[in-house]
């Protein structure tokens, strides 16, 4: 059965508070599966399985699938629809409260697939990356504007701290755009399927990741300010900051959105050296 048929079969009522929009376009499902590159060696962690339409396709291809679902009304539907699969584990929990490192422990070749409510997208991605969860890739349906921020390059308005965070740890690839007509109920925004391939090592080697991300966040907190003014929040004396900018070869009159990840790394290392 397709998504609409399962929804009608169980007379499922959508929960607006959970931001539920279920994918009904089978061509998008196929592109997610193809883009995620799932094989029998892979353990898949799926966040937001809905009524299990995509989950079935994952179960056919993966070694095992762990699906995380918050809505208690969907649990019996998923249990019934997927009862024939012995490689399926359903976790009834808020993904924001999951210990992903614990879930991924002693599992090989972990790939994540997610169709999340848009309000939890950034927190989930941030946690998976900053907590150094051991996964190979994340294929995710997200709001178009968020995908554009993740995939941005310097010198554009979309480029920001989220861009740097994701691209520090991952290569990014947009798989396809998805219109509101591909969902029930229809969301008010366009969506994009994007894949994040985890790098074996961070894109740049820095002396302190904590300082690196502090510099990045401070640089984007007030986008229209120069780096010199933005980085005053670090509470470093004027002479030391002048020295750090000079050693990094970066003009303090530039704005954060003009710096590449490599330049952020160079600047944070020079600041680290003077602390």
Curated annotation (Swiss-Prot):
The protein's Enzyme Commission number: 2.1.1.182
GO molecular function, one term: 16S rRNA (adenine(1518)-N(6)/adenine(1519)-N(6))-dimethyltransferase activity
PANTHER family: DIMETHYLADENOSINE TRANSFERASE, DIMETHYLADENOSINE TRANSFERASE-RELATED
Disulfide bonds: none
Family: Belongs to the class I-like SAM-binding methyltransferase superfamily. rRNA adenine N(6)-methyltransferase family. RsmA subfamily.
Top-rank taxon: Bacteria
Keyword rRNA processing: yes
Cellular compartment(s): Cytoplasm
Record-given protein name: Ribosomal RNA small subunit methyltransferase A
Primary location group: cytoplasm
Segments forming a coiled coil: none
Keywords for this protein: Cytoplasm, Methyltransferase, RNA-binding, rRNA processing, S-adenosyl-L-methionine, Transferase
Residues annotated for S-adenosyl-L-methionine binding in this entry: 21, 23, 48, 69, 94, 115
GO CC, any one term: cytosol
Catalytic reaction list: adenosine(1518)/adenosine(1519) in 16S rRNA + 4 S-adenosyl-L-methionine = N(6)-dimethyladenosine(1518)/N(6)-dimethyladenosine(1519) in 16S rRNA + 4 S-adenosyl-L-homocysteine + 4 H(+)
Annotated function: Specifically dimethylates two adjacent adenosines (A1518 and A1519) in the loop of a conserved hairpin near the 3'-end of 16S rRNA in the 30S particle. May play a critical role in biogenesis of 30S subunits.
């Amino acid at each position: 059965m397709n998504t609409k048929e399962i929804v009608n079969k169980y007379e499922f009522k959508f929960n607006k508070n959970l931001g539920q929009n279920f994918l009904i376009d089978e061509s998008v499902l196929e592109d997610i599966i193809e883009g995620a590159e799932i094989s029998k060696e892979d353990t898949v962690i799926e966040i937001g399985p809905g009524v299990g339409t995509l989950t079935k396709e994952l179960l056919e291809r993966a070694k095992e699938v762990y699906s995380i679902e918050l809505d208690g009304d969907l649990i019996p539907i998923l249990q019934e629809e997927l009862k024939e699969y012995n490689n399926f584990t359903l976790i009834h929990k808020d993904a924001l409260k999951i210990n992903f490192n614990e879930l991924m422990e002693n599992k090989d070749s972990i790939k994540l697939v997610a169709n999340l409510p848009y309000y939890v997208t950034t927190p989930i991605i941030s946690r998976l990356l900053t907590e150094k969860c051991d996964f190979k890739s994340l294929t995710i349906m997200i709001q178009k504007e968020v995908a554009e921020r993740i995939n941005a390059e310097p010198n554009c308005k979309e480029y920001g701290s989220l861009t740097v965070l994701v691209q520090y740890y991952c290569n990014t690839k947009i798989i396809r755009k998805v219109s509101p007509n591909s969902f029930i109920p229809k969301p008010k925004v366009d969506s994009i399927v994007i894949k994040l391939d985890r790098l074996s090592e961070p894109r740049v080697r820095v002396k302190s990741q904590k300082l690196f991300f502090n510099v990045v966040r401070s640089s984007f907190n007030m986008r229209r300010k120069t780096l010199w003014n933005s980085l005053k929040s670090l509470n470093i004396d004027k002479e030391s900051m002048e020295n750090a900018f000079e050693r990094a070869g970066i003009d303090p009159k530039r704005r954060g959105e003009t710096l590449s990840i490599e330049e952020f790394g160079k600047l944070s290392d020079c600041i680290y050296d003077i602390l």
